[in-house]
Design a protein with these regions (language model features):
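NAD(P)-dependent short-chain dehydrogenase/reductase
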Residues: 1-50, 57
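Short, surface-exposed alpha-helical segments at coil->helix boundaries
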Residues: 30, 91-95, 127
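Mid/C-terminal beta-alpha module of Rossmann-like enzyme folds, strongest
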Residues: 36, 45, 61-118
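Amphipathic terminal alpha-helices
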Residues: 111-113, 125-134, 142-158
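C-terminal capping/gating helix-and-loop segments adjacent to ligand/active sites or protein-protein/ligand interfaces
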Residues: 119-120, 125
Length: 158
């Protein structure tokens, strides 16, 4: 009947989140960057070939605002939009950390397979069609190295 302008935004995994690690299956996506940069070992529970759909905290804020400010007529009939992100492997994530912070930092990432977490992560989509999100003014991060640099420059505790 048109009484409610409901909108659904499907978000990529947001990383690198500041703060402490938690029990979420996706926690390692931030932890393998955040903890080594803080001088702490980080355990990665999935294989280096695991691909993930990611977005930075700053970019997701812009996308949420764009989704809110867009006219209802810009949304598809489902009122559901995939938010743009980047698709990278865990290996690419660690390589980006290595380029930004060096070998000693990247070597703090240790791989210890956790079948339960791996099983969950492998069910997540690795890529999305985000054309509608882009049309609404949502942006994509320049790459994972840019996400790491953004964390170091703006969110990493000093």
């Amino acid at each position: 009947k048109g009484f409610v302008d409901g909108r659904s935004l499907r978000l990529p995994t947001v990383t690198v989140r500041p703060g402490k690690p938690n029990k979420a299956a996706s926690s390692f996506a931030s932890g393998i960057i955040r903890e080594p940069l803080s001088g702490v070992e980080a355990v990665c529970p999935v294989d280096v070939s695991t691909r993930m759909w990611l977005v930075s905290p700053r970019t997701i804020i812009g996308s949420l605002i764009a989704g809110y400010e867009a006219p209802a007529s810009a949304f598809p009939p489902s009122h559901s939009v995939n938010v743009p992100g980047i698709s990278v492997t865990v290996r690419e994530m660690v390589d980006a950390l290595r380029r930004v912070a060096g070998d000693a930092v990247a070597d703090r990432v240790v791989f210890r397979h956790d079948p339960a977490i791996d099983r969950i992560v492998r069910t997540w989509p690795r890529d999305f069609d985000a054309k509608v999100g882009h049309a609404l003014g949502m942006r994509t991060d320049a790459g994972f190295e840019a996400i790491v640099r953004q964390y170091v420059e703006h969110d990493m505790p000093r």
